[in-house]
Each structure stands twice: as structure tokens, then as C-alpha cells.
């Protein structure tokens, strides 16, 4: 952490918890009688509440998207490169809202929250949630904040799915939908990766069928393996080759099965760190929400028909080396938007970092994103 905060940082921020008493009906047929959402906001809401931007997070994301919680923080929020004064989502112009979704493990109601009916953590009794459920809860959050219409709803990866869902479920409540490194539905391969991750977690002997809280345990090894598998899919072959190659940790082979290659050590480190901060039941929920996302499902697989209600303008961005959600998946969305006669701008960004490229401020990505959000700001007089 530097001695002073960067001039383009939103600075020190504090999350707040908002409680909702009205029951939320879920796609699975169950309901949450009450729930909490943890939120951070950056910038100021203008007089007519027209300059608000919603940030939707990806699988392992949360509400802390920008700035610092204390001067001792080593790193800022997960999308600090794009949120702040003079950045693509300029907090001198926009009021930015970022939340931890339902089912999360960073303060919003989820599996590690106490079930009011039992006084114990929900664990596996927490209902399965979908992208549409998240969007419904976010709409209530907008109501609470006095925001009738978002200037833009923005998200990368799973967050992009939420930005797309917003345009279908609440078409008059957003002007722009920004969908980055995302997909209109998972391929069989993506579902398979998620299933391997879930099996890694549920087969951990300390999982206890999701009731590990009662045992004061964490299925750490399962979480580690799940994260290691996921992390491989977030990087490109080229970026892994450039960063690690076949470099050894020491000068010679050890002829054993400990981590000898630098890439092995890196994956173990990432898995270990993740297992210390993330909840296993939340990981299961998030991956299942990914699997279920398919707006075209009720329209015979025709995405252009699913898009019929949309009124907003879209920005869709993909990255050349993203093989988790490849440019072909973004092009599928764009073609459907064009067929549905929607306004859409699209760019494929040449970047070597795979799926994680949406988190890295490369010049062309930043320029396109900034130019688009500048137009959004001018439209609402921000």
C-alpha cells in the first residue's frame, strides 16, 4: 500500500448492509422471507437520479469493486482499474452501486448466514438462486436507493449475464447494458468444468453434505481444487506460457510429486488463498446459477425472440484469447440483438490474458469502454 491513495482512486470506502423484509419469490419455487444485501457506492447521485450505474460481479466477486477499506489494504477493489475519477466508469460523473449478490459469502444473505428458522447457518438448505433472482433483488435495491432507471448496468463474465438479464426483465429501468467477456448460455464444456469443481468440493471429507459449519470445519482441499480448475480456464495458453513456461522452482527435477514447476506452485497458491476467503456452498450456488442461465430456453432456443422486450442500447465486448467465454459466444449475442433490431456496439479486443482480460486495463479496451461510458454520461447530463 502506498503512503497516499492514488489520485484516480475513489479513496476510502465503507460497505453498508441493507435489509429487505418483503419476501422474494425465487425461480426454484422457494422464497426468502427477508434478506440482506451488502453494498458499496462511489460518486454522487444527481438530483434526478439519472446518473446511476450498477456493477454486477462475477463468480468470485463481491461488493468491494473500487477503492480501499483502510490505508493498510495492499490492493484496492476488484475492478478499481475501471471505476474512479477519470476512469471508464468515472465517479466524477456517475453514482456507482456495487453489491454482493444473494447467496454470496461477503455479507449478503447466503449459505453461511443464520437461518432465522433454525438459528444455524443455512448451509445446503439455502435455496438455489438464478441470475434472474439476483436481478430481481437488484431491482429492489434500486427502489431502496431511489433509482428508477440505471444509466447503465455493467458486468463482466457472470456479471455480464446479469446485465443482459436486466434488459429482459426490467427493460424500462436501464438505458444501457454493458456485457463484457460473457455468454448467452454455457456450453457443455463449461458446464463440465463447473461439475468437476462441484465434485471436488462435495467429495471433500470435511464437506459434511454442506453442514461443515456445524462441525467448525471448512472443505478447504475441495475449494482449493475447484479454484485451481477454474483458474486454468480464466487464463490463456499463451499467457500461462509467457508467465511460467516450463520453469522449475529449483534447478533440477526431484522425481517426486510435490510442486516442481512454477505453474504448479502458482495454482496451489491461488487455491490456498481462495479457500481461506470463500465459502464452499456459495461456490456450488454460483456455478449452478451459471449453468442455468439461458434466456432463450423459454423461446425454443431463439435468443432474438428472448430479446424482444429489450429497450436499452448494448455494448458487447469480448477478448481474443478468452476460451472460457469465447468471442464466438459474444458474436452469438450480437447477431441475436441485430436480428431483434436492437441497438448494439461490439468489439473483440486483442489481448493475451484469456478470460481474465476483462479485469486488465489494456489500452484498446480502456479506450472503447471510456468512449462508450462518456456517451452514456452525456446522455444523462452527467
Curated annotation (Swiss-Prot):
It is found in: Cytoplasm. It catalyses: L-homoserine + succinyl-CoA = O-succinyl-L-homoserine + CoA. This is Homoserine O-succinyltransferase. Belongs to the AB hydrolase superfamily. MetX family. It comes from Marinobacter nauticus (strain ATCC 700491 / DSM 11845 / VT8). Disulfide bonds: none annotated. Transfers a succinyl group from succinyl-CoA to L-homoserine, forming succinyl-L-homoserine. One of its GO terms (molecular function) is homoserine O-acetyltransferase activity. It holds the Pfam family Abhydrolase_1. The gene is metXS. The record marks 324 as: Important for acyl-CoA specificity. The keyword Transferase applies. Residues 51-359 form the AB hydrolase-1 domain.
